[in-house]
Amino acid sequence: MRLLPRLLLLLLLVFPATVLFRGGPRGLLAVAQDLTEDEETVEDSIIEDEDDEAEVEEDEPTDLVEDKEEEDVSGEPEASPSADTTILFVKGEDFPANNIVKFLVGFTNKGTEDFIVESLDASFRYPQDYQFYIQNFTALPLNTVVPPQRQATFEYSFIPAEPMGGRPFGLVINLNYKDLNGNVFQDAVFNQTVTVIEREDGLDGETIFMYMFLAGLGLLVIVGLHQLLESRKRKRPIQKVEMGTSSQNDVDMSWIPQETLNQINKASPRRLPRKRAQKRSVGSDE
């Protein structure tokens, strides 16, 4: 009975080994075949991916060419080689916020045909993307004919918004014109990044309001202190002390004539005790 568990353990160990030895090379070949088939499928998929990438790379140049052609067709009009433009800022290239900025644009016709200058416009744009408008100013209609070998000067002014102070923006100034054949041209007279300056001189609305508020607050403090002092004075009434005349020296007798003073002094001597006693005796007799 003790040997049965040992025999069962040996059978469990020996049986799998015999199965493996019997299957031997065939089993190994089957495993190898499966591995090779998997590798072939992986290689095929890699080759297909490379072919797809090559096709995409071949298609990309054609797409870029098409995009460039579309941009050329749908792009904005360019400047004419027969015309020149110049710009001059009246107060220098300083752009104070909430203040007028003036500039002059000169147009020179170097060709043999007339040019019709239609309009002049300006706009602030996002510095990183000039297609994004921040502030678009009103276009100035001109409709001026400039003959060949002649010049013309145009004035334009705009006011940067006050909240734009202290920030950089792209300033674009365009001059739009055409020839007698109807060909439209546009010259970017100015196309640079500028900084709008915060306005420091003068008083703005916020500063005035702050001063008015401080003045009103100071007035209220003064009125409050005055009322407080008045209330304290009312709570402590002044005690009136009656001062009598202790002697004639305290009485001003200068306004009384001297004769009258002499009579008063004679008529009001101090009564003697004898006279008082006589009066008392007379009264008792009665």
Curated annotation (Swiss-Prot):
Q: What does this protein do?
A: TRAP proteins are part of a complex whose function is to bind calcium to the ER membrane and thereby regulate the retention of ER resident proteins. May be involved in the recycling of the translocation apparatus after completion of the translocation process or may function as a membrane-bound chaperone facilitating folding of translocated proteins.
Compartments it resides in: Endoplasmic reticulum membrane
Taxonomically, the superkingdom here is Eukaryota
Glycosylation: residue positions: N136, N191
Q: Which residues lie on this side of the membrane: Lumenal?
A: 19-207
Query: Please, what other remarks does the record include?
Result: Seems to bind calcium.
User: Which PANTHER family does this UniProt record tie to the protein?
Assistant: TRANSLOCON-ASSOCIATED PROTEIN SUBUNIT ALPHA, TRANSLOCON-ASSOCIATED PROTEIN, ALPHA SUBUNIT
- Protein name (Swiss-Prot/TrEMBL): Translocon-associated protein subunit alpha
Q: What is its main location?
A: endoplasmic reticulum
In this UniProt entry, the residues modified to Phosphothreonine are: T260
Which InterPro entries does UniProt cross-reference here? TRAP_alpha
What is the species of this protein? Homo sapiens
**Which parts of the chain span the membrane according to its record?**
208-228
**Residue stretches of biased makeup (Basic residues):** 268-279
Name the residue ranges with Acidic residues bias. 39-75
A UniProt-annotated Pfam family = TRAP_alpha
Show which residues sit on the Cytoplasmic side of the membrane.
Answer: 229-286
Kindly indicate where the leader peptide sits in this chain: 1-18
Domain comment (free text): Shows a remarkable charge distribution with the N-terminus being highly negatively charged, and the cytoplasmic C-terminus positively charged.
Q: Which family does it belong to?
A: Belongs to the TRAP-alpha family.
Recorded topology in the membrane: Single-pass type I membrane protein
Q: Oligomeric state and partners? A: Heterotetramer of TRAP-alpha, TRAP-beta, TRAP-delta and TRAP-gamma. Interacts with palmitoylated calnexin (CALX), the interaction is required for efficient folding of glycosylated proteins.
Protein's GO biological process? cotranslational protein targeting to membrane; positive regulation of cell population proliferation
Which positions bear Phosphoserine? Answer: S247, S268
Where is region (Disordered) located?
39-83, 261-286
